[in-house]
Amino acid sequence: MGLLSVDLLITLQILPWFFSNCLFLALYDSVVLLKHVILLLSCSKSSRGEWRRMLTSEGLRTVWNSFLLDAYKQVKLGGDAPNSKVVRVTSGCCRRRSFSGKGESECHLLDFASSNRPLVVNFGSATUPPFISQLPTFRKLVEEFSDVADFLLVYIDEAHPADGWAAPGVATKSFEVKKHRSQEERCVAAHKLLEHFSLPPQCQVVADCMDNNTNVAYGVSFERVCIVQRQKIAYLGGKGPFFYNLKEVRHWLEQTYRKRUVPTCELIM
């Protein structure tokens, strides 16, 4: 099968999912607009905020590119884990250091994997609402399973930058992040996220390089989670935001290590 035929086949596979996402964005905009109109008619002060449409040309390009990233990703369940280049994010150093893409700050994703423990890798950014909403759950996973597994958070390109396809759900000043124009800006954003959510020290934090090589290799786009074991992909989560599921990660860890959380009531008894 020729390259053109493969590209055509992938496009045909993507189209139904792409159009379903467009429909979701159109319905979302309709509901938000209706709510905005009702608030205006009721003279509510909360209606004075800016209404941001999600179904825009930039939004459509972003969604389409996310499906292309997923379709052409290098990572496959049971296959070799891509050893992508990343940059360490350490406390207090991001603002002072100059990131040229070289030097001791740069490392590889599999540097954080050990031979006898699984590595849970969580990809996302501060401007992705589903990723942010699940960070407390991820933090709990780290706290409960750090005795049997290693954890790594990879900060990628912003999903909804303030100067791009901005989302209404990230209007707070804490997460108004613009498009990264340098490695330093990306690391600073990752460091702010690390501080805001007080991630446990057992979870290492790195940032994708500016060529987005990790994002491309793992087909992340918005958010994704996977588990690396013996340099193979033991678990591969679905494409975010709709198939990003940390419950499956918990289930995998529990099934693999027969570990169950003891209910609080039993501890009291």
From Swiss-Prot:
List the residue ranges forming a coiled coil, or say none. Answer: none
User: Signal sequence: where?
Assistant: none
What is the scientific name of the source organism?
A: Neoceratodus forsteri (Australian lungfish)
Q: Name the active site residues.
A: 128
Q: Which residues cross the membrane?
A: 8-28
Identify the domain of life: Eukaryota
Q: Which reaction does it catalyse?
A: 3,3',5-triiodo-L-thyronine + iodide + A + H(+) = L-thyroxine + AH2; 3,3'-diiodo-L-thyronine + iodide + A + H(+) = 3,3',5'-triiodo-L-thyronine + AH2; 3'-iodo-L-thyronine + iodide + A + H(+) = 3',5'-diiodo-L-thyronine + AH2; 3,3'-diiodothyronamine + iodide + A + H(+) = 3,3',5'-triiodothyronamine + AH2
Give the main location: endoplasmic reticulum
Q: Name any one GO molecular function.
A: thyroxine 5'-deiodinase activity
Topology with regard to the membrane? Answer: Single-pass type III membrane protein
What does the UniProt keyword field contain?
Endoplasmic reticulum, Membrane, Oxidoreductase, Selenocysteine, Thyroid hormones biosynthesis, Transmembrane, Transmembrane helix
Q: Please give the subunit comment from the record.
A: Predominantly monomer. Can form homodimers but homodimerization is not essential for enzyme activity.
Q: Which residues lie on this side of the membrane: Lumenal?
A: 1-7
Name this protein carries in UniProt? Type II iodothyronine deiodinase
Compartment(s)? Endoplasmic reticulum membrane
Write out the topological domains of type Cytoplasmic. Answer: 29-269
Q: What does this protein do?
A: Plays a crucial role in the metabolism of thyroid hormones (TH) and has specific roles in TH activation and inactivation by deiodination. Catalyzes the deiodination of L-thyroxine (T4) to 3,5,3'-triiodothyronine (T3), 3,3',5'-triiodothyronine (rT3) to 3,3'-diiodothyronine (3,3'-T2) and 3',5'-diiodothyronine (3',5'-T2) to 3'-monoiodothyronine (3'-T1) via outer-ring deiodination (ORD). Catalyzes the phenolic ring deiodinations of 3,3',5'-triiodothyronamine and 3',5'- diiodothyronamine.
Give its E.C. classification number: 1.21.99.4
Return the PROSITE patterns for the record: T4_DEIODINASE (PS01205)
Which InterPro entries does this one have?
Answer: Iodothyronine_deiodinase (IPR000643), Iodothyronine_deiodinase_AS (IPR008261), Thioredoxin-like_sf (IPR036249)
> What are its GO biological-process terms?
hormone biosynthetic process; thyroid hormone metabolic process
Which family does the entry's similarity section mention? Belongs to the iodothyronine deiodinase family.
Q: Which Gene3D superfamilies match?
A: Glutaredoxin
